[in-house]
Amino acid sequence: MDNQFIFKYSWETLPKKWVKKIEKSEHGNRFDTNTDYLFQLLCFLKLHTYTRFQVLIDICGVDYPSRKRRFEVVYNLLSTRYNSRIRLQTCADEVTRISLVVSLFPSAGWWEREVWDMFGVSFINHPDLRRILTDYGFEGHPLRKDFPLSGYVEVRYDDPEKRVVSEPIEMTQEFRYFDFASPWEQRNGNEG
């Protein structure tokens, strides 16, 4: 059974309200869904005889600050039975909570913690939603586009005090001027 058959069959079989948009490409197929139907769609893709996407490869997040629902959460699935991959995407904002899928894919707990830690997207009734990649005292979510590149605090080891200290970051340069003009566009017309 080829990838296109699985995709076409899934699309024809699924309730249309579950899927907002589909995309077929050489890099893999994609379903966009609403957060309300995420769990049902994942159940279908995992358990149906002609899909069998039983491996959750990854859950990752993307931040689009200009969108109303700025966070996109992407579920990458693999069907080892049919050698096929599919991406499932849903959107959320700071207050929208996404369905927990640990009951379907036990490894999802780790991925959901990572998405929460890096982006601040929360999951409904997650049993252990705490930081996984950043320090427990870390403030903010570092993969958000509005997170400052230098962070909020500096963590360093203080040798005289023999302990780790956190201090607010002090920028030595308060004002910077960025010249975005290309030096190639400023060339004299006489050169040549």
Swiss-Prot record:
Keywords associated with the record: Electron transport, Membrane, Mitochondrion, Mitochondrion inner membrane, NAD, Oxidoreductase, Respiratory chain, Translocase, Transport, Ubiquinone
Function according to Swiss-Prot or TrEMBL: Core subunit of the mitochondrial membrane respiratory chain NADH dehydrogenase (Complex I) that is believed to belong to the minimal assembly required for catalysis. Complex I functions in the transfer of electrons from NADH to the respiratory chain. The immediate electron acceptor for the enzyme is believed to be ubiquinone.
Signal peptide: none
Protein name: NADH dehydrogenase [ubiquinone] iron-sulfur protein 3
Catalysed reactions listed for this entry: a ubiquinone + NADH + 5 H(+)(in) = a ubiquinol + NAD(+) + 4 H(+)(out)
Transmembrane segments: none
Subunit structure: Complex I is composed of about 45 different subunits. This is a component of the iron-sulfur (IP) fragment of the enzyme.
